[in-house]
């Protein structure tokens, strides 16, 4: 009997591990719905509807990204309610300068973080660690740049989005004064409005207070229902 019980619990543990081999249990749709009933601040907001003139260029809904694969089935940008509110304030500040926001990525389902980690073979210099989950998984991170409001043209930045090189680091000196000004303007306005730039990516901004929000594993199709 003891052997049978031991075998049974061992098999159960194997099933649990195979379902979540990195030890993170992202909340799913029903848990998310329950969480926003108790705390409306946890709601995911559609940024395209919430922020006037925002531009979406969701690269993970295309093959134009470092994986060379289409990761998302829909080109959507969601963020938690206070994140969206802070971004709308930043958009108003950028508008005074003649700029608008272009979003490359916002909320990211946990499954995408696992995919990126495995593509990078465990190197977490430029992708998140699935043993912890990412700020994107919490709806509290944004990948973005600036565009000219009059033309929609992107401002020149030190590198392309998702360029995995030291030139992408916000701390890296930039010789071109216009490019340096563009990068520094993006960072200063975002940090004024409650975000923190990521140490290795000039385009990545974490909402200050992201720790209060759970890792989520909800697909965009579910959010759109």
Model-assigned labels for residue ranges:
Residues 112:
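Short, well-ordered surface patches within globular domains
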Residues 18-104, 119-200, 209-225:
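Extracytoplasmic cell-surface/polysaccharide-interacting catalytic and binding patches
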Residues 116:
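Short active-site loop/helix that positions an aromatic residue
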């Amino acid at each position: 009997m003891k052997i049978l019980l031991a075998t049974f619990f061992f098999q159960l543990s194997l099933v649990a591990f195979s379902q979540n081999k990195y030890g993170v249990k992202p909340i799913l749709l029903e848990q998310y719905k329950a969480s926003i009933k108790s705390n409306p601040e946890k709601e995911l907001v559609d940024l395209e509807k919430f922020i006037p003139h925002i531009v979406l260029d969701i690269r993970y809904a295309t093959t134009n990204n470092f994986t060379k694969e289409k990761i998302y089935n829909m080109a959507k940008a969601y963020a938690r309610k206070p994140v969206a509110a802070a971004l709308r304030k930043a958009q108003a500040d950028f508008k005074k300068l003649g700029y608008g926001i272009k979003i490359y990525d916002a909320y990211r389902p946990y499954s995408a973080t696992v995919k990126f980690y495995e593509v990078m073979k465990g190197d977490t210099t430029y992708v998140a660690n699935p043993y912890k989950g990412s700020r994107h998984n919490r709806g509290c991170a944004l990948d973005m740049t600036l565009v000219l409001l009059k033309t929609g043209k992107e401002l020149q930045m030190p590198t392309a989005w998702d360029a995995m090189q030291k030139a992408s680091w916000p701390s890296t000196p930039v010789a071109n004064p216009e490019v340096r000004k563009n990068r520094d303007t993006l960072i200063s306005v975002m940090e004024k409005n409650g975000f923190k730039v990521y140490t290795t990516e000039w385009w990545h901004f974490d909402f200050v207070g992201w720790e209060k929000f759970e890792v989520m594993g909800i697909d965009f199709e579910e959010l759109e229902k």
